[in-house]
């Protein structure tokens, strides 16, 4: 390959004289071929001129230094060259490490939760939309960015025109902007308990199991989403998401579980897939209410549930309403007092509902018929359960149960709890 030599200035060239002396002449370096320059360099370093005395070798040393510092060999203009520096940090670090440095995610501020404002830069996937073989010069490589065969002939390496290359680059930039715009769009989701709360939202059925079992008749509802932090010696204050969900099929089978992850969607997935493996079966009276009134205390949470007739509805805490719909309970009254911690409330509710006594169990334990008095039937009792064994002859003693009464219930039963607006007379309209 022929090479051309460019010089910054003029360089003294050595010529031989008749008297054995060396003369200096100023010649343009453009007139010297590259081979002669390389020959002069080799002569100065290894030839017979190096054997001269120190007084006469000074001009040759300056010539060698000028050749090494002021000369550069350029390649022809039709060839491309790419700078390669193996010692640069760009070639030693991964893309994630470079993004951490650009976004300042490796300092103490990121560990302490700083930098949450909107001015913070966001990470972009620069590889998205790129095609192997595409570059800024617009070369067409068969098998990479163009087909190998076209119209029955094998294509050769070609290059796009300048206008075509500008159009391709503009299309790529426009496509990336559309992706960013779609990413920023917020999809309107189902309303939960309140406007901007995760509570009460549906996550759909759990994922199919490894053996192929599906849970299409189950539904998952979010009860609580919390940010929790743990202090570690290596990372400092580490943030994670804790999610409490409940699942149920509306036919008595329901359960709950907790999922924790650094990403919110991962926590949702873990919680709903774990809850389906910890199910309770809740007995229901005529598939609409509980069998009897329940009063329980779980830790510092007090829950009092009452059986109600059909059409009463659910008048409870909003989390209890969500869980009862997943179970299949349609009519019930519940009052929560004390702590309203969501985890304690959920555990206490499942603890009480799973331990209720059915009418058949009560009849077998007492050895008597269990009857129900309904308002629409008058004084006629309705038998709802009979003992499987022998019927007991002596009736149940009429003893006053030793239970702690609620003062609010006593006032309601005695008519002492009245609304201040009950006797208000309104003007006729």
From Swiss-Prot:
Domain S5 DRBM: 218-282
Segments for region (Disordered): 108-127
Ribosomal protein found in the keyword field: yes
Assigned GO CC terms: mitochondrial small ribosomal subunit
Keywords assigned by UniProt, alphabetized: Mitochondrion, Ribonucleoprotein, Ribosomal protein
Classification via Pfam families: Ribosomal_S5, Ribosomal_S5_C, Ribosomal_uS5m_N
Annotated GO MF terms: RNA binding; structural constituent of ribosome
Feature: compositional bias, Basic residues: 111-125
Domain of life assignment: Eukaryota
Main location: mitochondrion
GO biological process: translation
Locations listed in the record: Mitochondrion
InterPro entries the record matches: Ribosomal_Su5_D2-typ_SF, Ribosomal_uS5, Ribosomal_uS5_C, Ribosomal_uS5_N, Ribosomal_uS5_N_CS, Ribosomal_uS5m_N, Ribsml_uS5_D2-typ_fold_subgr
Listed PROSITE patterns: RIBOSOMAL_S5, S5_DSRBD
Protein family according to the UniProt entry: Belongs to the universal ribosomal protein uS5 family.
Quaternary organization: Component of the mitochondrial ribosome small subunit (28S) which comprises a 12S rRNA and about 30 distinct proteins.
Protein name in the entry: Small ribosomal subunit protein uS5m
Species the sequence originates in: Pongo abelii
Name of the gene encoding the protein in the UniProt record: MRPS5
């Amino acid at each position: 390959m022929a090479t051309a030599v460019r010089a910054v200035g003029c360089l003294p060239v050595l010529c031989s004289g008749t008297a054995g002396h060396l003369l200096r002449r100023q010649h343009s370096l453009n007139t010297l071929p590259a081979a002669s320059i390389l020959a002069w360099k080799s002569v100065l370093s290894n030839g017979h001129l190096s054997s001269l005395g120190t007084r006469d070798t000074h001009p040759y040393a300056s010539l060698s230094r000028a050749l090494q510092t002021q000369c550069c060999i350029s390649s022809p203009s039709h060839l491309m060259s790419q700078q390669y520096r193996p010692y640069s940090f760009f070639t030693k670090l991964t893309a994630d490490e470079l993004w951490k440095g650009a976004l300042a995610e490796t300092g103490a501020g990121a560990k302490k939760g700083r930098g949450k404002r909107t001015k913070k830069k966001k990470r972009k996937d620069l590889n998205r939309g790129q095609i192997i073989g595409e570059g800024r010069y617009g070369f067409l490589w068969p098998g990479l960015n163009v087909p190998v065969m076209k119209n029955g002939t094998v294509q050769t390496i070609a290059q796009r025109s300048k206008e075509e290359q500008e159009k391709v680059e503009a299309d790529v930039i426009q496509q990336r902007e559309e992706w960013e715009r779609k990413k920023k769009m917020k999809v309107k989701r189902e309303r939960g308990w309140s406007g901007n709360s995760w509570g009460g939202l549906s996550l759909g059925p759990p994922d199919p199991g490894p053996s192929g079992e599906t849970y299409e008749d189950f539904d998952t509802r979010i009860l609580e989403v919390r940010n929790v932090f743990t202090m570690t010696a290596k990372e400092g204050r580490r943030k994670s998401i804790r999610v409490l969900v409940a699942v149920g099929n509306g036919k008595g089978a329901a359960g709950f579980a907790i999922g924790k992850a650094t990403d919110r969607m991962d926590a949702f997935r873990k919680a709903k897939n774990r809850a389906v493996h910890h199910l309770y079966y809740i007995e229901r009276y005529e598939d609409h209410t509980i069998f009897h009134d329940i009063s329980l205390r779980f830790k510092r949470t007090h829950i009092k549930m009452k059986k109600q007739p059909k059409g009463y509805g659910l008048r409870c805490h909003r989390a209890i309403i969500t869980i009862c719909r997943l179970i299949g309970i349609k009519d019930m009254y519940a009052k929560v007092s004390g702590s309203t911690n969501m985890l304690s409330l959920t555990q206490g509710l499942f603890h009480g509902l799973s331990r209720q006594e059915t009418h058949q169990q009560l009849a077998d334990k007492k050895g008597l018929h269990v009857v129900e008095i309904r308002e629409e039937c008058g004084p006629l009792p309705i038998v709802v359960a009979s003992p499987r064994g022998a019927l007991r002859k002596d009736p149940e003693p009429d003893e006053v149960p030793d239970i702690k009464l609620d003062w609010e219930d006593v006032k309601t039963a005695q008519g002492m709890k009245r609304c201040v607006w009950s006797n208000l007379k309104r003007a006729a309209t």
